[in-house]
């Protein structure tokens, strides 16, 4: 009777853990689907950033700027630094698993390995983000040396960048230039900083695409496990 009672208790604990495992796997799959969508959004944003930065570089190297060129320099510059390229990864399920004692509740070791790989690559991406931030700081500093940023209008939505052309004309009449400097070397250095950052952004794009593929592989593995 004692043995049977022990076995019954063990079975109940086993069933409870399997229910927990199932819930965690379902939750993990949903988190990963959100990550896949989020990464797609950021990949698209990086494509737009690369396109804008290339146009901006070419414009900065022009010998003579038209009023349209000057407006473009302002708009592309400000849109460049307003573009969000960093994915907002979900971590709810992973955090819950860690709080529950790690991945011990997950019996499929291939899933455990894939989750660990996914989380490890996420940390590698975060290291790259620190390097990106250093380059963004250089670009911000260059913009503060070159642009009358006080002509920036109040945005009504994300990436809604508007330039107050009337204010820019007023500053031109007051200072003699639509920019804070007339030194072309400042603009060339700015173009150089943008080129460097485009390279970093391109590499970052590759990294988050790799993470997206890891997420898709893990989703497939989770779906197979949940189908059993």
Describe the function of each predicted region.
Residues 7, 11-228:
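Long, hydrophobic alpha-helical segments that serve as membrane-spanning/inserting helices
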Residues 1-7:
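Hydrophobic membrane-insertion alpha-helices, especially the h-region
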């Amino acid at each position: 009777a004692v043995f049977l009672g022990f076995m019954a208790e063990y079975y109940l604990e086993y069933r409870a853990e399997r229910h927990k495992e199932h819930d965690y796997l379902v939750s993990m799959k949903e988190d990963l689907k959100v990550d896949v969508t989020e990464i797609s959004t950021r990949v698209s944003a990086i494509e737009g950033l690369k396109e804008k930065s290339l146009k901006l570089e070419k414009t900065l190297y022009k010998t003579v700027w038209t009023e349209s060129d000057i407006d473009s320099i302002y708009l592309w510059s400000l849109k460049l630094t307003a573009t969000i390229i960093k994915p907002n990864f979900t971590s709810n399920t992973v955090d819950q698993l860690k709080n529950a004692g790690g991945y011990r509740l997950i019996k499929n070791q291939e899933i455990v390995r894939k989750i660990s790989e996914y989380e490890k690559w996420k940390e590698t991406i975060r290291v790259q983000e620190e390097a990106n931030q250093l380059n963004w700081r250089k670009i911000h500093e260059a913009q503060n040396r070159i642009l009358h940023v006080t002509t920036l209008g109040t945005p009504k939505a994300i990436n809604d960048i508007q330039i107050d052309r009337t204010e820019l004309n007023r500053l031109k009449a007051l200072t003699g230039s639509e920019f804070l400097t007339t030194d072309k070397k400042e603009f060339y250095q700015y173009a150089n900083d943008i080129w460097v950052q485009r390279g970093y952004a391109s590499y970052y794009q590759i990294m988050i695409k790799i993470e997206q593929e890891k997420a898709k592989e893990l989703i497939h593995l989770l779906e197979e496990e949940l189908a059993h």
